[in-house]
């Protein structure tokens, strides 16, 4: 199969790409290197800096569109993976949907569903927004609320997740969350782990 992996978190897509290639699939990884992590990618969409960075990034993404079609599967690391304001990401997602067979949207990090579940369903005894029955009011929790609740970014996230063909979750916490909203198309797929090491690891003997 031809598979397009869009963006990466903590080498998740890097390791998936490696495994799929070993199985004989053609894989293209697009991303910004997960920012300062500098992860490997086949097509670089790292956004620059400066007052015109957004416009330059938009032009570059548009120029690359022909390379993002004709795949059997496109997997997004997160709905918000193009490096643009949410209002400007719709056309790029729709292009991927229109010109590829299947679109998979990963539940691999925070988005509207994670925030909504944490605020209103409290699936876990403690989490990003509650500890027991006490709501967190610290800056870290409020940042996620401000980012996704009643915002264009939250609306865009819901649009993509509702439209996607499949939603893989990489942690059981995400499965418990997304399974509430999408019980049919949500599937738990554990994080890939690379067991081979280029350098030997020596156990610490305490001396």
Write out the residue ranges for each language-model feature.
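N-terminal subdomain of nucleotide-sugar transferases
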Residues: 1-43, 98-102, 164
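Short N-terminal targeting/anchoring amphipathic segment
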Residues: 2-6, 66-88, 102-106
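Glycine-rich, highly charged phosphate/nucleotide-binding loops
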Residues: 47-67
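A conserved, positively charged/aromatic
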Residues: 68, 119-124, 158-163
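Acceptor-binding helix/loop patch of EC 2.4 sugar-transfer enzymes
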Residues: 105-150
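A short, active-site helix/loop in glycosyltransferases that binds the activated sugar's phosphate group
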Residues: 114-115, 145-186
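Acidic anion/phosphate-binding donor-loop and adjacent secondary structure
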Residues: 176-206
């Amino acid at each position: 199969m031809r598979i397009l992996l869009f963006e990466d978190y903590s080498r998740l897509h890097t390791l998936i790409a490696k495994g799929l290639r070993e199985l004989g699939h053609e894989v293209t990884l697009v991303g910004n290197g997960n920012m300062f992590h500098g992860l490997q990618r086949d097509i670089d969409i790292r956004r620059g800096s400066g007052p015109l960075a957004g416009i330059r990034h938009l032009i570059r993404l548009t120029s690359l569109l022909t390379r993002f079609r004709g795949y059997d599967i496109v997997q997004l690391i997160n709905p918000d993976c193009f490096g643009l304001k949410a209002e400007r990401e719709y056309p790029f997602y729709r292009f991927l949907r229109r010109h590829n067979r299947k679109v998979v949207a990963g539940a691999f990090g925070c988005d509207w569903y994670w925030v909504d579940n944490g605020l209103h369903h409290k699936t876990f005894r403690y989490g990003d927004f509650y500890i027991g029955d006490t709501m967190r009011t610290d800056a870290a929790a409020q940042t996620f609320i401000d980012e996704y609740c009643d915002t264009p970014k939250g609306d865009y996230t819901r649009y993509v997740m509702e439209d996607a063909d499949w939603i893989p979750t990489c942690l059981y916490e995400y499965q418990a969350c997304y399974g509430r909203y999408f019980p049919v198309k949500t599937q738990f797929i554990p994080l890939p782990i690379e067991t081979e090491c280029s350098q030997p690891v020596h156990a610490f003997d305490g001396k």
